[in-house]
């Protein structure tokens, strides 16, 4: 901020009406690989492809469950192997679970169940605020 006061804002910050010298601060991360290394954070801005899946690594395979769905199932006393197996059989989808409300089913839609035009629209909305690269996978 002191340098900006002394020499003025850099051109891209000035265009946005911000008094800064180093304005390139926004990057979209992590990638899918980095998110695994970071302990299961979401893979960036993309919707999840499944609420449960098997993750294969050199060390072996393990099941990954959506922790928010798992918490909801626990609250509803439906967190059972049978329920998770049915979700797995449906490709990670919860749309077949009759004990979930319409809003809950919408909340846990997989990337394949979301209208892809929304992903494009959301990407367009955030693009002016991203200083570095961004990418988007469509499903």
Residue spans of the language-model regions?
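Catalytic alpha/beta core of large soluble enzyme barrels
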Residues: 5-6, 26-139
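Short loop/turn microsegments at loop-to-beta-strand junctions
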Residues: 22-24
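Short glycine-cluster motifs
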Residues: 1-20, 87
